[in-house]
Amino acid sequence: MRLSPVCYSFSRSRTIVLAGVLAVVSAGGTIGCTDVSGSSTSVLSIQFDTLPSPSVVVGDTLRDTTGAVIRPVVHAFNFKGAEILPTPVFFLSPDSGITVDSVTGIVVGDSLRSSPARIVATVGRLQAIQKVNLTLRPDTIFAKNAFDSLVYSISDTTKDVSPMLTVMLRHGVAPNDSAVPFYIVSFTIVSQPDPLLGELVNDGGTAAHVDTTDATGIAGRKIRLHPLHLSSATQVDSIVVNATARSHGAVVKGSPVRLVLLFKPPS
């Protein structure tokens, strides 16, 4: 009896065996799969790696934060789960907003759209998809919430996370400027009393040094304070953060933006 081809997709890394069909899934990418028949040189599944950038600027090529052009990466696997050299990979997009080179996969943004555009990678009969947003060129970056304070607690660490320190990315010149959404901004602590005292975190409390601007062009990071590294239980001081955006590898005008958190004990 021959089993029909089946394909499954999961968000976590794992290997699934179901009804005689093997689906090899890796985090950070989408997959396509088919039945297990064939030799060790036959492609059973493909993985399309997550793109290094969440968006492509209209009128430009999809690039990473260094300014380098992004070439989409597709991996192929045989029925043993081993990576093999695939037959030629072909790329296309069924959506407006981008054009995709069918051979290299290089993406160019040509117009804004309200939803992400799909990039489809095809190897033989297998297909996998990644999505990319369209955005505007960032011309300036400036502080949105440049200064805030944190009343820390020695005993209750849930209180030791600051409000969000934020910046805004804009395209064009005021008053005719526009928000730049879906764009990467990096944050770095450049000054603090102890190198282990504060760390940058996201909304979920996980350490993170980069953020992607929201629909209004705002990005930010919080600071988690580690009281163990205070010089005393009454220390009052500040932590300074720089926020930087890059375009074509060069810093965007206004970078780095200086953000300051004042921390103090309860009064």
What does each model-found stretch correspond to?
Residues 44-48, 90-91, 107, 187:
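An extracellular/luminal cadherin ectodomain-centered signature
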Residues 108-114, 226-232:
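Short, surface-exposed loop/turn segments at beta-strand-coil junctions that are enriched for proline
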Residues 55-60, 92-108, 190-221:
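Low-complexity "stalk/linker" and mucin-like segments enriched in Ser/Thr/Pro/Ala/Gly
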Residues 28-32:
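C-terminal motif of bacterial Sec signal peptides marking the signal peptidase cleavage site
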Residues 115-122:
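Append "Rare intracellular matches occur via the same short Y/T/C beta-strand/loop motifs
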